[in-house]
UniProtKB/Swiss-Prot annotation:
Gene (UniProt): mt:ATPase6
Molecular functions (GO terms): proton-transporting ATP synthase activity, rotational mechanism
SUPFAM superfamilies: F1F0 ATP synthase subunit A
Transmembrane segments: 17-37, 72-92, 99-119, 125-145, 170-190, 195-215
Originating species: Drosophila mauritiana
Protein name per its UniProtKB record: ATP synthase subunit a
Record lineage: Eukaryota, Metazoa, Ecdysozoa, Arthropoda, Hexapoda
Length: 224
C-alpha cells in the first residue's frame, strides 16, 4: 500500500536528470510527420477533427475574429488532448495533473486577452462589467461580481483540468491497491471496473481538452 496516494503524480528522476516534463513535448515529434509521409487513416481522421474544430471556433469567434486566430486554440486542444492520453499509460508522467502546466497555459492566454481588450476596446470592456438590463441600484454590485468572475477565469480553467485528471488517476490507484488482497474471483470484477474506469477517463481526457479550448475561445471573443 502506498504511503501517499498522490505519490503517483510526483516527478521522478533518471540519472539525476528530471526528464518528466519532456513527455509534454512528445507530440511535437509525432505530429509534424504528417507533412512528409503518406497520410494514413489516423491522419485523415485527425485532420477531419481539426477541420471541425476550426469551423466551430470560427463560429464562436464571430465575424470580428482575425484570420488564423483559431489555430492557437486548435493547437491548445491538441497539446492538452495528447498529454491527457499520455498520462493514461503506465509509468508515463501526467503533466496535465499539475497546475504548473495548466496554469502556465491559462494565465498567459487570459492576460493577453485582457491587455488587448482594455488597450484597444476600453469602452467595450467596461460595458461587459454591467450586463444589459441591470437596475441602477445593482450596478455597483454587478461590477464587483463581474470583475471577480473575470479575475478567477484562468484559475478555474487550470484547476478544472487538473482536478479532473487527478480524480481519475486516484480512483485507478485506489482500485489497483486493493487487488493484492482480493481473491481471484473478485480480481476479475476489479479488472472489469478498472477497464470501465479507463474508458471513462479516456472520455474525460477528450472532454476536458475540448472544454479548455472552447472556454479560451469564448474568453477571446469577448474582447473583440
Amino acid at each position: 500500500m502506498m504511503t501517499n496516494l498522490f505519490s503517483v503524480f510526483d516527478p521522478s528522476a533518471i540519472f539525476n536528470l528530471s526528464l518528466n516534463w519532456l513527455s509534454t513535448f512528445l507530440g511535437l515529434l509525432m505530429i509534424p510527420s504528417i507533412y512528409w509521409l503518406m497520410p494514413s487513416r489516423y491522419n485523415i481522421v485527425w485532420n477531419s477533427i481539426l477541420l471541425t474544430l476550426h469551423k466551430e471556433f470560427k463560429t464562436l469567434l464571430g465575424p470580428s475574429g482575425h484570420n488564423g486566430s483559431t489555430f492557437i486554440f486548435i493547437s491548445l486542444f491538441s497539446l492538452i488532448l495528447f498529454n491527457n492520453f499520455m498520462g493514461l499509460f503506465p509509468y508515463i508522467f501526467t503533466s496535465t495533473s499539475h497546475l504548473t502546466l495548466t496554469l502556465s497555459l491559462a494565465l498567459p492566454l487570459w492576460l493577453c486577452f485582457m491587455l488587448y481588450g482594455w488597450i484597444n476596446h476600453t469602452q467595450h470592456m467596461f460595458a461587459h462589467l454591467v450586463p444589459q438590463g441591470t437596475p441602477a441600484v445593482l450596478m455597483p454590485f454587478m461590477v464587483c461580481i463581474e470583475t471577480i468572475s473575470n479575475i478567477i477565469r484562468p484559475g478555474t480553467l487550470a484547476v478544472r483540468l487538473t482536478a479532473n485528471m487527478i480524480a481519475g488517476h486516484l480512483l485507478l490507484t485506489l482500485l489497483g491497491n486493493t487487488g493484492p488482497s482480493m481473491s481471484y474471483l473478485l480480481v476479475t470484477f476489479l479488472l472489469t471496473a478498472q477497464i470501465a474506469l479507463l474508458v471513462l477517463e479516456s472520455a474525460v481526457a477528450m472532454i476536458q481538452s475540448y472544454v479548455f479550448a472552447v472556454l479560451s475561445t469564448l474568453y477571446s471573443s469577448e474582447v473583440n
